[in-house]
Design a protein with these regions (language model features):
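Conserved catalytic-core segment of NTP-binding enzymes
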Residues: 1-60
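Nucleotide phosphate-binding site architecture
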Residues: 57, 63, 73
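Generic C-terminal helix-cap and adjacent flexible tail
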Residues: 93-100
Length: 100
């Protein structure tokens, strides 16, 4: 993550001064894995408000949908992954309404 932030800073400095990070999204989150929780805590500690509150869980249906040539909403709109992406979309829109 630190390397990615560094790369974004370099691109911003040399190529696109208007570039900014809209937010950090935690995905493939495995609720059963303690390391996942520790990493999430560290990310929230360092990046605080930049971290989206919505977390995309590890979900079999999410991994299956591309092989069927469908979005997750088309494939299984009621699975946990689809619901999380809908929630993320709403969170993204709320954030952007506040900044406009």
């Amino acid at each position: 993550l630190a390397q990615l932030i560094g790369t974004i800073r370099k691109v911003k400095k040399k190529l696109n001064r208007g570039l900014y990070i809209e937010g950090l999204l935690m995905s493939m989150f495995d609720q059963r894995n303690s390391l996942t929780h520790k990493v999430a805590e560290e990310i929230k500690k360092h990046f605080n408000e930049q971290v989206f509150k919505t977390i995309i869980p590890r979900n079999v249906r999410l991994s299956e949908s591309p092989s069927h040539g469908k979005t997750i909403i088309e494939y299984d709109k009621n699975c946990a992954g689809a619901k999380a992406f809908n929630k993320l979309g709403n969170e993204f829109l709320r954030r952007n309404r506040k900044t406009q």
